[in-house]
Amino acid sequence: MVVPTPFFVLRGHLSSVTSLSFVSDGILYSGDANGWMICWDLSVMRPTHIWRAHTKSILGVYGCSSEVVWTHGRDMQVARWHLNPPTGGSHIPLSLLHAIQQEKKNDQQSSSSLTIVSSVHKGYFFQTNNLTFCSFAISPAAGLLVVPNTVNAEQLDVYALNDTSDSDRRDNCGKRLQHALEPKPQIEKTGAVMSVALHVKYNKVVLVAGYESGHVVQYIADVDAAQKVNVYFQQVWQVMYAEKVHKEPVLSVVFGNDNGYLYSSSADDYIVRHTICLSKETHTNPESMKTGHPGQQCLRVRSDDKILVSAGWDGRGRVYGAKSLAKLAVLKYHSETCNCAAIQPGSNLIALGSKDSRISLWQIY
């Protein structure tokens, strides 16, 4: 088993790093517990943008490009942000990066800080549930965005992603397509939704949800049907798979890219591989691996479907074989809990975000 060291550490945040997202052109987005977002240019390992995206902790980040990123915060907002290119290709000095966050905390901002922060503007936002720690899920291929239900944390709402391009709307509620998805009557009690993910295969969209009860549920719908408003979700989404595979709340669910599997982790010490069920005939029993490490709260699969990376409560990242689930490496650097992980598309570059406010970068396999 390999025990590597990080080749670089990013130190821009002043609070716990809670979410990470790569885009393919060497850009990394990071969000923290105070609602701050930073856009990093990894070609020079320097920040290009910083802004206060939310007034509370950031739950999720989805980078579309170096100019567009979605964020989900505990302040009841999902927002899309547009970033202006850095003036003259300039980057923000680390000292100024920290000063901006401190100035905002003290309600004082200098002219230089305001210039930097104003290079980012909000293109659209809508209100959502803040009673859960579950982040959103986005699928540009399906044109869908999924979040916990506005009122009931045990249910899910589906929104149109592309409809949110209308920045003149003032209702702040988004275009909700289906609402209150839940696995009843197959499962009566699931507890709150803990993690969600979306995947498109052929003309089907698969929505997987991990619940507080330890259940993992796969819903499936035709892409065309899911993109239309329907007040009865049962007419659009079908439960194809519902299994209680964890003894503790599910912390993360993630799809492989093209290997026909999805993976889940939990507050227990198991990682579970599930077959993607496009029909009830394709249902197979899940495969579990006891890792001996409870609380692997973020899973990510590399774009070649060969490795799986986790971020753990014990401050360690771990690399597993996506096929065998065997542990291949331990990423040991952080002094506190690792909250999030990300893998750059088409690369072996891994990022880990921690409660110690640092982001470690690794190149492995």
Swiss-Prot record:
It is found in: Nucleus. The keyword Transcription does not apply. GO terms for biological process: chromatin organization. Belongs to the WD repeat ASA1 family. It holds the Pfam family WD40. This is ASTRA-associated protein 1. GO terms for cellular component: nucleus; TTT Hsp90 cochaperone complex. PROSITE patterns: WD_REPEATS_2, WD_REPEATS_REGION. PANTHER family: GUANINE NUCLEOTIDE-BINDING PROTEIN SUBUNIT BETA-LIKE PROTEIN 1 (PTHR19854:SF1), TRANSDUCIN BETA-LIKE 3 (PTHR19854). It comes from the Eukaryota. The gene is asa1. InterPro entries: WD40/YVTN_repeat-like_dom_sf (IPR015943), WD40_repeat_dom_sf (IPR036322), WD40_rpt (IPR001680). Component of the ASTRA chromatin remodeling machinery complex. Its main location: nucleus. Keywords: Chromatin regulator, Nucleus, Repeat, WD repeat. SUPFAM superfamilies: WD40 repeat-like. Component of the ASTRA complex involved in chromatin remodeling. WD repeats lie at residues 12-50, 53-91, 188-230, 245-284, 292-330, 333-365. The keyword Ribosomal protein does not apply.
